[in-house]
């Protein structure tokens, strides 16, 4: 019965819906008519455009009629009407000169309705790179008699004519020719008034009078574009306007109705009550008369009709009640069904009155396409709606979830079966929960027997790890036994919970009870017992700890390594003290020993002095060291220890006899230089000490002060030094080479400056002899003493050293105030070397000559470098040994320059540049000739 009633009520509801829709539609149309009727105005504009396009199509023919009031006659018409019997070629030539446009060519197959680009660019032809039309049809006309052209030019003809298709003209346009044409046309028109009563239709229009009505030529395609723009901006045309409409002449795709037709269609929709709102009919020509064409292209914003309609129309609730009483009874019996949005209160179903609910509700975007809620709910009865069934999982929203009764009963049964349990907390709070494991979706997990066994093992491990008996628990055993019984009586059940506050079942309950009782007894005793205030004596750990304050166990190997390191460190400290005390007078005997950082003595075995004797020189004046006490850390050391130098990987370096000899010689040199500075403390604390073979040597240096002060004041250290101002040992081979070089240098100086002879005195020769003897004693390994050494060198070398030392002494006497004495630069001749002058008559491309020049140049540069180095080092060594590291270094280039002194004003002149300062590569073309050599060729 319900289905029959529903089928019978459906056509009634459809008719009611259509009537309601028609009423609402008429209301919206009336409101739109009250707001100046914008859509009708746009329709009038379209109708005016259609009429103008039809007029333009009628007037667009090849023969254009002239204005009735004008007396203008075209030259072309006069020529054709009153033509004398002349040859046709002359007529075509005149027509080509006066009646054609050179720049404008009109296509024959150009469509009559072409409208793009719009308006003022419509008659402009856009040049593209497409294939041009083959002008073979014009070739015969253009090439008949090109010599017969008159050379006249006119302005561009904007009007089309059939003569322009067959005429050619120049590209230049002139205003004078235009005025000539005007005069000619007026002359012929004045003379033709009497002869021809009816003027001949002209086909030539002047540019000033042409295209005045071009704005009215709106074609059908432009109207279509305007319609598309209106549709895009939100305007819609009513379907009733286009129903049963006959196409007029000139319209191709659609027609726009007039105002009378629109009013008739509105009367059908509005009824007799809405007829008074129809506006007066107006002629579209009068409407568009004062509107310029440029304003038609301005974008127009769509009217805000929907908002006004929403404000005026009130909300109306639609009650979807069935028409039969049976349906009313069934709807009363059923529960109230409402549509519930997520996390929002329920809302009744309201009617969509022109978008009111769409704008008011926040979820309107989902209901845009719904025209009417009644249309959607027509196929469903109100009593057939059922609430949605929710799943068992938890929901994130605040909506109510309907749970079936079966699940509620099952949950109640499980709660009744599980007994309530209490946990003995401090607050004694009890809570009843279901004991089981659950997933996140509130589903139970089945626990197998293997999982139970693993859980029991894990609980045992946790309990064994938590319970550790300490000293405090042993002291409180009596109190624990008294309180344990009380706690066990009070506790009934123990319950653990997970992170999500879910209960966890316990397997071994007795062990957990015991553990909790012990923990609580410890807390109670900690608060009440007086033993808490007393400090319990626990053994303190003295040693190293980690970052987490954990003790680091120290093994025996680590102790042995630390003992070795402390012994080496203490030996270095004692060596430094002994080295400092050697150079100072010590009246009182002091005890020297090895101590650790905590001032504990270190035991010295029998092997230690023998190894230390290779590196340490002990002064005889120092008192005997006292016997140190035994250190408990080093008492177990029985392994031999290595004292000496080690590599980066802590490997021992064996010291040979040659190294010991070199160390002894170096120590003697450093001690001799230190004695010159008024017996100040040694500046070389890091110098290794000599072997026990040279003990007598160092002792003699300390005991014989008076003997050495005389010699040290007269002698000075001669040699090279390192960057740390330490002397470098000079071997005999180097001395021989230096002697030969000095002899060559002195011979060169004697040849260049022969006017000033060299005078050698006796005193500096004796000093030089002593210095050479001392230097020779340094190199001889067989000699043990430093002072009493006899020279066995070549006398020639000695003479060279004497001369060099005399030059330094004389320089110091001449310039006592200068810290660095000046060295005179020897004069050289301005002539080029003989080996270089050979290139004048040979080609620069000769390979043999190139090789010889390069070899000679390198040799000269090396010799000049040696002279510069020797002069700077000898001069600076006389002044002070510390200035050696800051001495000027020669340049490392292959192009040598002359050694000049910057302190002299003559040498510092920028403009002065002699040929002797130039190498064969750097010589300028003004001063000397170029040899044609460059570094890029070899």
From Swiss-Prot:
Alphabetically ordered keywords of this record: Cell cycle, Cell division, DNA damage, DNA repair, Meiosis, Mitosis, Nucleus, Repeat
Annotated Polar residues bias: 870-879
Subunit structure, as described in the record: Interacts with Rad9 and spn-A/Rad51.
InterPro entries: BRCA2 (IPR015525), BRCA2_repeat (IPR002093)
GO CC terms: nucleus
Function: Involved in and required for double-strand break repair by meiotic and mitotic homologous recombination. During meiosis, has a dual role in the repair of meiotic double-stranded breaks and the efficient activation of the meiotic recombination checkpoint.
Protein name: Breast cancer type 2 susceptibility protein homolog
Disordered: annotated span: 320-359, 409-434, 870-938
Localization per record: Nucleus
Each BRCA2 repeat, start to end: 537-571, 638-672, 713-747
Primary location recorded for the protein, binned into one broad class: nucleus
Basic residues compositional bias, start-end: 926-938
Biased composition range(s): Basic and acidic residues: 320-339, 409-425, 898-915
GO biological process entries: cell division; DNA synthesis involved in double-strand break repair via homologous recombination; meiotic DNA repair synthesis involved in reciprocal meiotic recombination; meiotic recombination checkpoint signaling; regulation of DNA-templated transcription; response to camptothecin
